[in-house]
């Protein structure tokens, strides 16, 4: 198993620790000391599915592949705008793929579970190219 392409997409709006201190009982110093985080990107005008599809398309481009080459889509995420359909199936439609799709909800460790699931699909011959 190997990763042959990556892609990312980020919300345009930045939320600083100082912004948070205006709406919560906290401070930049308190957050930085405990987490090391100074800023984070938050979705305001964008939506999760569009950002995921943008990242997926960039990963395909980086790998020199087309959506038709994908056998399976795995999406690991914590934030869902609604229960159904899955983010993976929305991404499938947005990029023009036609394959099985699944969302995994495992918070920060989700990437590890997604890689483990992908490896199992590859080892059993159920998929060759996984997004």
Predicted regions and their residues:
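Short glycine-rich or small-residue beta-strand-to-loop segments that form or flank ligand, phosphate
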Residues: 71-77
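Conserved catalytic cysteine-centered active-site region
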Residues: 32-34, 38-50, 77-130
